[in-house]
């Protein structure tokens, strides 16, 4: 039994000490030429209109959706409405959750 163990250790040591050469590197082949002439460059694409859009009339508003329609709107705002402000002011500092007495015992 000892002979088999010694033989296995010897085979393992010889295999670990072997200096194998690096595997040969094979570069991929160059791509085949598709055509022997150069392709012309594509035409430039212009993403603008040749003229400016017409000015919208004051009395009509185009509503675009599933069913486009034209809604007539007045040129001036309706009377009686105050100008709308943003979302309002921030809440005052006295609007906060009241402090309870049950937490005062932990602060001492």
UniProtKB/Swiss-Prot annotation:
Residues 52-88 form the VM domain. GO terms for molecular function: serine-type endopeptidase inhibitor activity. Keywords: Secreted, Signal. This is Vitelline membrane protein 15a-1. It comes from Aedes aegypti (Yellowfever mosquito). Its main location: secreted. Expressed in the middle and posterior regions of the follicle cells. It is found in: Secreted. Belongs to the vitelline membrane family. GO terms for cellular component: extracellular space. Residues 87-108 are annotated as: Disordered. The keyword Hydrolase does not apply. GO terms for biological process: oocyte development. Residues 1-18 form the signal peptide.
